[in-house]
From Swiss-Prot:
GO terms of biological process kind: DNA replication, removal of RNA primer; mismatch repair
Protein name per its UniProtKB record: Ribonuclease HII
Protein role: Endonuclease that specifically degrades the RNA of RNA-DNA hybrids.
Keywords: Cytoplasm, Endonuclease, Hydrolase, Manganese, Metal-binding, Nuclease
Pfam families in UniProt: RNase_HII
InterPro entries: RNase_HII (IPR022898), RNase_HII/HIII (IPR001352), RNase_HII/HIII_dom (IPR024567), RNaseH-like_sf (IPR012337), RNaseH_sf (IPR036397)
Transmembrane segments annotated in the record for this chain: none
Keyword Isomerase carried by entry: no
Catalysed reactions, semicolon-separated: Endonucleolytic cleavage to 5'-phosphomonoester
Positions with a binding annotation for a divalent metal cation: D25, E26, D120
Species this chain originates from: Ehrlichia ruminantium (strain Welgevonden)
Family: Belongs to the RNase HII family.
Source superkingdom: Bacteria
Length: 212
């Protein structure tokens, strides 16, 4: 289970001086449709019941994830950042993800003065704060794991809303990822404005419809 070992180690390096350490994670990197969503999270207290059961969002059932989300959003400082379809297509998915992360951090920094950022992954976006990238960070750091939960619940809700407009793609279940039913629907109905044109399945299907 994630804990605050990394956060506490950073505090030691700072001689235990007050240091606002923010965890960041994203959701939607590999999806064929919908935005990339990033969350930035700061825990004011590392030793309370708020942290119980927090884990990498991918390891939680939707019901458990929602329950933890409801608990933590009132007890931590957090912010969300989006990177939209046109940004994914124009700048590529990695750069768009970094845009979403920067937006989440900028939103949070408007309310607290960020000192240090820990990010899930192996790359650090161009941000004005000292930062550390941690591969598998959402399984190690509670701050990052909480960010993964908030980002996941936020994005899932968005895809469920879009499903109402485009029910044939089953986004309420696949959340825009390239599942068999999603691919089948793409070949049958074509793409929507919410699909990522630069992703191979979409570009292939677009070409097929254009030349049919």
């Amino acid at each position: 289970m994630p804990d605050f070992s990394i956060e506490n180690e950073i505090l030691k390096l700072k001689n235990n001086k007050e240091c606002i350490i923010v965890g960041v994670d994203e959701v939607g990197y590999g999806s064929l449709a919908g935005p990339v969503v990033s969350a930035a999270v700061f825990f004011p207290n590392y030793n309370n019941e708020t942290t119980q059961d927090i884990n990498d969002s991918k390891k939680l059932t939707p019901k458990t994830r929602q329950k933890i989300y409801n608990k933590i959003i009132t007890r931590v400082k957090w912010s969300i950042g989006f990177a939209h379809i046109f940004e994914i297509d124009e700048y590529n998915i990695l750069n768009a993800t970094h845009i979403a992360m920067k937006r989440a951090l900028t939103g949070l920094n408007a309310h607290i003065d960020i000192d240090y950022v820990i990010i899930d992954g192996n790359k650090i976006p161009n941000i004005p704060w000292n930062a550390q990238a941690i591969i598998g960070g959402d399984t190690i750091s509670t701050s990052i794991a909480a960010a993964s939960i908030i980002a996941k619940v936020t994005r899932d809700r968005l895809m469920e809303t879009l499903h109402i407009q485009y029910p044939q793609y089953n986004w309420n279940k696949n959340k825009g990822y390239g599942t068999k039913d999603h691919i089948t629907s793409l070949y049958k109905y074509g793409k929507t404005i919410h699909h990522r044109n630069t992703f191979t399945p979409i570009s292939k299907i677009s070409y097929m419809f254009k030349n049919s």
